[in-house]
Every structure is written in C-alpha cells, then in structure tokens.
Amino acid sequence: MAKKVVAVIKLALQAGKANPAPPVGPALGQHGVNIMMFCKEYNARTQDKAGLVIPVEISVFEDRSFTFITKTPPASVLITKAAGIEKGSGDSAKGSVGSISRAQLEEIAKTKLPDLNCSSVDSAMRIIEGTARNMGVAVSD
C-alpha cells in the first residue's frame, strides 16, 4: 500500500547551499522530517547548478519519510543571468535595464519547457519573452 502524504512543502533554495537554518529548518521541522538528510540530498542533487535558485517540492509522508522533486530555476533568475544584470527594472514601462538575444531567449525557453504549461519551444519563448518584458529586459533580434 502506498504511503499517505501528509504535507507538500515548496521552497526556493540556492543550489548546493541548503542548511538547517531558516527557511529550511522551520519548514521541515514542523513536519518531523530529518532536516540534515534533506540538506545533504538536496545539495548533492544541485551541486552542478551552483549560483542558481532551484525550487524544490518536498512530499512528507505520515511515517516522516520524504521525497522531493527539483524544478527548473525561475525564469527571472535565468533572464537576469543572461542579461548580466542584478535585478529587473522597478518600472518596466519607463525603459529597459538590459537586453538578451533571441538565441539566449530560446536557450532559457528550452531549459524552462518541462515546468511551463505548454508543449512547444515557440510558445515557451513567448512566455519567457513576456516575463523579460515585465522585468524591463529587451529582447533583440
């Protein structure tokens, strides 16, 4: 018989840098999960993606065991990295703070495709382009 899921916890953590300090400790501790075991497994799985924020979805079972799924980094993180900027514009209507090329946009769309609600790279590119526009990042041809 399958184990019963008692909680699903969603966190966004730096790749390879999970530790028992907040936000990880309190979020997992209240469900009785072994925090150090999670940190070691998460860091091992994400060590090749250093410098990125990796969202994780942790399923906690009634016997206090857990499984987790790592997602792709948020589009905004990938766009700021590609554009070489620290953060997006506070007011995207007034002007752009950077730009990315179509090739970079396509690369980001291919990376994000498994987590987006679309099936083609073309539609994924339109979604990512909209995110870039809202951040004040121009897409050049």
UniProtKB/Swiss-Prot annotation:
CDD domains: Ribosomal_L11 (cd00349). The gene is rplK. This is Large ribosomal subunit protein uL11. GO terms for cellular component: cytosolic large ribosomal subunit. Disulfide bonds: none annotated. GO terms for biological process: translation. Signal peptide: none annotated. Belongs to the universal ribosomal protein uL11 family. PROSITE patterns: RIBOSOMAL_L11. Part of the ribosomal stalk of the 50S ribosomal subunit. Interacts with L10 and the large rRNA to form the base of the stalk. L10 forms an elongated spine to which L12 dimers bind in a sequential fashion forming a multimeric L10(L12)X complex. The keyword Flavoprotein does not apply. SUPFAM superfamilies: Ribosomal L11/L12e N-terminal domain, Ribosomal protein L11, C-terminal domain. Keywords: Methylation, Ribonucleoprotein, Ribosomal protein, RNA-binding, rRNA-binding. One of its GO terms (molecular function) is structural constituent of ribosome. Forms part of the ribosomal stalk which helps the ribosome interact with GTP-bound translation factors. InterPro entries: Ribosomal_uL11 (IPR000911), Ribosomal_uL11_bac-typ (IPR006519), Ribosomal_uL11_C (IPR020783), Ribosomal_uL11_C_sf (IPR036769), Ribosomal_uL11_CS (IPR020785), Ribosomal_uL11_N (IPR020784), Ribosomal_uL11_N_sf (IPR036796). The lineage of its organism: Bacteria, Bacillati, Cyanobacteriota, Cyanophyceae, Synechococcales. One or more lysine residues are methylated.
